């Protein structure tokens, strides 16, 4: 048998054996490493900041040994039991060229997402365990010290919201300012640009993750809603990342 195939089988078996679901507040984030590659340096330079207006604070979704978060049941207050992990938070990133523009996708994980309407039936329809939000920062060249932000696309209540380029009031140096909020009209948590200062989380890029962590993020079913109505997917995972970049193209 081909040695490469054997190695891949062993890695997959090891991941399946070690990966386990743990409490949302027990997941240890990856410390932000010193960036080495051009891609990683650009991801750190343009790392966005996030203000929480409604709902949970971001939490790490996976840790080094592949253990994955169990999230939170979608009942109770929107920020119930999820106002921040004592172990620290996390922001994930993955980058690629799209039509000669460098795209850096950043993603945050939230233990739950739910509607604010108190009626039990409505809550069941719109509340769910796990939530992912992401923003794409489009720049001209990751190698240049004078790289310019050409545009920003973010996951919105419906589809995507974009600005090309973002207005100066929404940018602090090289960092886009975003707000995680609840859209009462559409009944969904999502991202929007804001003038307010937010917080930074330790960044880990897709390539910097351990193999076990990447395996868990790629193979976890994040959507526990009936018929996968929430459409929840880890935005950086293989098979999803490029598709989202193409759909969010703002130019």
Curated annotation (Swiss-Prot):
Coiled-coil parts of chain: none
Main localization category: secreted
Gene Ontology CC terms, in alphabetical order: extracellular region
UniProt key word Lipid metabolism: no
Signal peptide positions (record): 1-19
Motif Hepta-peptide GHRHDWE motif boundaries: 127-133
Domain of life: Eukaryota
Keywords from the named record: Glycoprotein, Secreted, Signal, Virulence
Localization per record: Secreted
Residues annotated as glycosylated: 146, 218
Keyword Transferase assigned: no
Induction: Differentially expressed during the developmental and plant infection phases.
UniProt function note: Secreted effector that contributes strongly to virulence during infection by P.capsici.
PANTHER family reported in the protein's UniProt record: DOMAIN PROTEIN, PUTATIVE (AFU_ORTHOLOGUE AFUA_5G00600)-RELATED (PTHR33657:SF8)
Family: Belongs to the Necrosis inducing protein (NPP1) family.
Record comment regarding domains: Key residues/motif important for the effector activities are degenerated in most NLPs, including the nlp24 peptide consisting of the conserved region I (11-aa immunogenic part) and conserved region II (the heptapeptide GHRHDWE motif) that is important for phytotoxic activity.
Protein name: NLP effector protein Pc129485
Protein's organism: Phytophthora capsici
């Amino acid at each position: 048998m081909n040695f490469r195939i054997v190695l891949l089988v062993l890695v997959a078996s090891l991941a399946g054996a070690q990966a386990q679901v743990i409490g949302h507040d027990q997941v240890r984030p990856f410390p932000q490493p010193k960036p080495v590659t051009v891609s990683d340096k650009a991801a750190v330079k343009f790392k966005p900041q996030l203000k929480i207006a409604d709902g949970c604070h971001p939490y790490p979704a996976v840790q080094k040994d592949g253990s994955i978060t169990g999230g939170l049941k979608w009942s109770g207050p929107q920020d119930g039991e999820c106002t921040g992990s004592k172990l620290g938070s996390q922001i994930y990133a993955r980058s690629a060229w799209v039509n000669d523009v460098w795209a850096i996708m950043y993603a945050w994980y939230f233990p739950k997402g739910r509607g604010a309407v108190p009626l039990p039936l409505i809550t069941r329809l719109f509340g769910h365990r796990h939530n992912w939000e992401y923003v794409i920062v489009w720049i001209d060249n990751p190698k240049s010290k004078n790289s310019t932000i050409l545009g920003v696309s973010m996951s919105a209540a419906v589809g995507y919201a974009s600005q090309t380029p973002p207005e100066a009031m929404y940018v602090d140096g090289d960092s886009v300012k975003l707000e995680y909020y609840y859209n009462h009209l559409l009944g969904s948590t999502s991202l929007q640009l804001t003038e307010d200062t937010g917080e930074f989380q330790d960044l880990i890029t897709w390539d910097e993750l351990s193999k076990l962590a990447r395996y868990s993020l790629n193979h976890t079913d994040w959507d526990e809603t009936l018929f996968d109505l929430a459409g929840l997917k880890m935005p950086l995972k293989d098979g999803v990342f490029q598709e989202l970049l193409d759909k969010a193209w703002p130019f």
